[in-house]
């Protein structure tokens, strides 16, 4: 089984909303797309790589708090922060938030893009518990491209969950990690332009050895070609 190749003008991105590395990667991708004047020619098609299922555990807050200071320095404009809400409200699951993005895809890939980034920032910047339905809907209400009533109905009846999970189960073995990009020409790359490692065991922290944001310009151009 191989990952599906998207059509020209589309970049498939396999990730989890709870992954800050994917959040940085998508931010850089959107920035490159805008800078190159290709907002109307290149779109992201979100695929799920559900980390809580892969790891059979929720993402620990300690991992989050180790990653955010490192990632935040690479894109200070995102205003990512350590978790600053009550510890009891830490979102132990991102399955519902990811489901919301896949439900929004039935409206448009553009709507899914907007909701995905809004939910990421609600988590990583605003410390909101995106495991909760009302929080997901409240975030969706800030997204101009999303039909919130249709999204709410889709989440109530679970219409997107089945197809999302089938796709995840079918392709998880081919995804190298979050984020994993697939281009229309078949090129694939995990966490573009970046090489990192972890120092220490429990309580360790990530070290970025290489980081080249310019690779996103090439990815966008290739997708549009």
Regions found by a protein language model. Name each.
Residues 1-6, 225:
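Basic/polar N-terminal segments that are highly enriched at the extreme N-terminus
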Residues 6, 95, 175-176:
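A generic fold-level signal
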Residues 6-12:
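Extreme N-terminal starter segment of soluble prokaryotic enzymes
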Residues 13-19:
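Aromatic-flanked redox-active Cys/Sec active sites in thiol-based oxidoreductases
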Residues 16, 49-51, 186:
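An acidic- and aromatic-residue-enriched active-site/binding cleft used to recognize and process polar
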Residues 19-22, 181:
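The canonical Cys-X-X-Cys-His
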Residues 24-127, 132-133, 202, 222:
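Structural alpha/beta surface segment adjacent to cysteine/selenocysteine redox centers
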Residues 26-34, 121-225:
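C-terminal cap of thioredoxin/glutaredoxin-like
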